A protein has these predicted regions:
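Divalent metal-dependent hydrolysis catalytic cores, especially in the metallo-beta-lactamase
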Residues: 51-67, 71-99, 126-132, 154-155, ...
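Conserved, mostly hydrophobic/aromatic
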Residues: 34, 76, 116, 156, ...
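Mid-to-C-terminal alpha-helical segments outside catalytic/metal-binding sites
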Residues: 3, 25-33, 37, 41-83, ...
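Bacterial N-terminal signal peptides that target proteins for export
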Residues: 1-10
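Short, acidic/polar
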Residues: 67-75, 138-148, 277
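Active-site beta-loop-alpha junctions enriched in small/polar residues
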Residues: 36, 89, 132-136, 159-163, ...
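Active-site gating/metal-coordination segments in enzymes
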Residues: 92-198, 204
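Catalytic pocket-lining loop regions of alpha/beta-barrel enzymes
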Residues: 154-155, 168-291
């Protein structure tokens, strides 16, 4: 009888050893590379922005919630996320979607950026601030220059959809390249939501970006938000990711500081076939180029995204652990 109990106990241990990693055994997410907290200067305009005739779609209810850094940190603590990159949403003030345009847009951008930097300064061990601009705004370069040397301003967030950037307009491409130059000069890591409003956005836009804009980042890291899309895995996102794969295929060491975040790219309902296809592309591009990101609060609770949904990706245990621990190294100064 005693022998039978030993055999049964041994079998149970084997089953436990073979089981997937649980929240108790998997490492915490070291960095969520993509979160937001609206500044008061932006919250004041959200109703007008969401009701604007210039909007191309309705605002997500989570977009207008008056959440604070305290809410973010509480969710990070609950989920086990150690640090987060907090993206300023100052660019909303200068969005062409805001109709009529704001008379105080440029001032509002600076105030909103200052708010984001102040949050990071108040929580330097947990939060990293990214200022933001509309790259087509006349004041964009001056706003970037204003934060040069500020120790708590570590990055620049660009949102091409919201800013109305057209990667097929040579003049706008040159202005975007100039913004990359300015960010590089200021030592700011760049986070770019590069999907545009073009209904056929995809490979042709990626090729323009890779050849005419990305080289202007020079040594600073560039993170492609939403893995080249704007959330989800539609035909445009697949086309963009495949174009990035092709651009890196001949020389994997090309653009060593290029990364892709996984913010809202998948969720618990993503079909298994799409998850498999995504992981296949991640491996062909280089799994080490992909980093955790949530798009909080638009992703919902961090635990559901970074723990539950991300665990459904068919990565090997080593790949999954490395992804959770991966953190893009920020520049330490201009």
């Amino acid at each position: 009888m005693f022998f039978k109990r030993l055999v049964a106990a041994g079998a149970a241990l084997v089953v436990l050893a073979a089981a997937p990693a649980t929240s108790q055994t998997r490492p915490p997410v070291r960095t969520d590379h993509h979160v937001h907290v609206h500044a008061p200067a932006i919250r004041e305009i959200l109703t007008a922005y969401c009701d604007s005739p210039g909007r191309i779609s309705a605002c997500d209810p989570a977009f207008v919630k008056p959440l604070t850094a305290k809410d973010l940190l509480a969710d990070m603590d609950q989920t086990g996320v150690q640090t987060a990159w907090i993206m300023s949403t100052a660019y909303l003030a200068e969005s062409p979607m805001m109709v009529p345009p704001l008379a105080d847009a440029a001032d509002r951008v600076h105030v909103a950026n200052a708010f984001t930097v102040a949050i990071a300064a108040a929580h330097p061990e947990r939060l990293v601030a990214f200022i933001s601009v509309n790259p087509l705004a006349p004041e964009a370069l001056a706003e970037i220059e204003a934060w040069k040397g500020e120790p708590f301003a570590k990055g620049l967030k660009l949102h091409l959809t919201n800013s109305g950037v057209d990667l097929r307009d040579p003049g706008q491409v040159r202005r975007l390249a100039a913004v990359f130059d300015a960010a590089s000069d200021a030592g700011l890591t760049i986070m770019i939501h590069m999907r545009t409003r073009a209904s056929d956005y995809g490979a042709q836009d990626v090729r323009v970006f890779v050849e005419q804009v990305l080289p202007h980042a020079r040594g600073v890291p560039v993170v492609i938000a939403h893995s080249g899309g704007w959330g989800g895995l539609d035909a445009n996102t697949w086309d963009a990711l495949e174009a990035f794969r092709q651009s890196l295929a001949t020389d994997h060491k090309r653009f060593p500081n290029l990364y892709f975040d996984l913010a809202q790219v998948f969720d618990a309902d993503t079909p298994p076939g799409d998850r498999e296809r995504l992981v296949d592309l991640m491996r062909r591009i280089g799994v080490d180029r992909f980093v955790p990101g949530s798009d909080w609060p638009f992703s919902g609770p961090l635990d559901a995204y970074l723990n539950d949904a991300m665990a459904l990706l068919p990565l090997t245990s080593d790949e999954a652990e490395a992804l959770r621990l991966r953190q893009v190294e920020l520049k330490t100064g201009a």
